[in-house]
Amino acid sequence: MTNKPVERQGSSRKLSYNSQFLFDGPAELPPKKQKVKKAKEKRLTFFTATSAIMLGVILGASIGSGAGVLAQNYLTRPPAIIVNNLESVNWVTAASSAAAPSVVTIRVAGQNSAGNGSGVVLTSDGYIVTNAHVVTLDGSTADVGLSVRTNWGEVFPAKLIGADPTNDLAVIKIESTKPLTPMVFADSTKINVGDQVVAIGAPLGFEATVTRGIVSALNRTIQVASSENPDEQGLQFWSGSSLPPVNLGVIQTDAAINPGNSGGALVNDKGELVGVNVAIAKTGSSAESGSIGVGFAIPANVVKRVSDDIIATGTATHGVLGVLITDSMSSDSGSAFPVGALVVEVTPGGAADKIGILAGDVVVRLNDKLITKSSELTSAVRQERKGTMVEIEILRDGSKLVFDVVL
C-alpha cells in the first residue's frame, strides 16, 4: 500500500494517508466567511417517482490543520438536494436523489494513517456495506477507528461487523439517532450492457458526488490487491505483490469512479443498487491516477449475499471446487488466447473429485457465466455461498460434459 506522508501544521506528528484517498491537508485555516445575500432556494429532502429536482454541489471534508473548524461547519451544512429549475431536471437527478440518502461517507483512521471511502446503507438500524479495503489500514482491520457521516450530515462512530477480503466487502454498523434509509437492491442478473447508471460517493472527499455513465460490460473478472497486504492499496489493480491477488467478478462502467468512491453505490435509472464501486483501471504508474472511464463494481446480488452472511454470522462463506487450474490456451504460440480453465490437479475428496472431473479437463462454463480463463472460474466459484449447487460444463477429449456440483 503506497502511503503519502502529510505533516499537520502545529504538530510534529505525521499522518500517512493511503493514496487511495488522495487527501492532502490544507496549509492554513479557511478564511473567515463573508456575509453574502442568500438567494432563495427550494430544498427537497424526499424523492418520489414524479419529483423533479436538481442535485447541488456539496464539498467534502478536508483533513489537516483546522479540521475541527471544518467539521463544525459540516455539522451545520449537511448535504442537501437543491432545486434551482424544475423545468430542466432529468433521470440522473431522479435516480441520484432516490439513492443519495442511502449513501454515506466513511472516515478511517489508525495510528499512522487515515483515509476516506463511501458506503451503502443496508438496514434502517445502521448496517452499512463498503469495501474491505476501505476499512483496512496497513493490511489490518485491527485498531482502526471508523466514523460515518450520514446523508443528512450527522457523524457517528462505527464498528466493524466483519470483512470478506475474498470479495473485497465489509459490513460496519452505527447507532444512529434516527432510522437510516436502506438502499433498494436491483437484481444484478437482469441488467444489460448499455443500461444507464449513476455512481454516487465521495471521490477525493467530495461527498454526495454524482457521475453518470452506462454499463460497459458484464461478467468481467479483474485482479486487485488483497486488502490484507500492507504494501498494496485498494481501488487499483494487483501489481504483483507477494500476496496472491483477489479475483473479482465485476460490472464494468464508464461512470467516473475515483479514489474515495470505493464502497459507494452504482445505481440504475430508478435509483436501485446494481453494484458497489470497487476499482478503476489507470494508464499511468502513479497511485494518484484518476478515472479514465474504466471503472468496476461488485454486482448487487453478490453484495447482498455476502453482507447477509456477515450480518448473520460475522463472516462470509465461499464455494470451493477443489481443483488447481491454469489458463487453457487456444494454441502454443505467443499470440494465443485463453479459452478456458485447464484443470491441472484435482483435490482428493473435493467437490470436483466427487463428480468425476479429471486433470486435463477444461472448464468453459459455470451456470450462465462463460469461462475463458482461470481467474474467471476462481471468482465465479468464490462468489457462491458454500454448499451451493452449480452447473459446470467442461471439455474432455473434444466432447462437452455437464455436471451438477455442490461447492
PLM features per residue range, with description:
Residues 49-50, 86-92, 107-129, 154-159, ...:
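A conserved glycine-rich beta-strand in the N-terminal activation segment of trypsin-fold
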Residues 56-68, 109-141, 188, 369:
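Catalytic histidine site
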Residues 63-118, 132, 169, 192, ...:
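N-terminal activation segment of mature serine protease catalytic domains
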Residues 65-83, 224-227, 277-328:
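Interdomain regulatory linker/hinge segments that flank or connect interaction modules
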Residues 68-72, 124, 131-166, 177-179:
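Catalytic-histidine neighborhood of serine endopeptidases
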Residues 110-115, 134-143, 180, 200-214, ...:
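Active-site loop architecture of trypsin-fold serine endopeptidases
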Residues 115, 251-252, 256, 305, ...:
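PDZ/PDZ-like groove recognition
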Residues 159-161, 178-207, 214, 298, ...:
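Active-site substrate-binding loop(s) of clan PA
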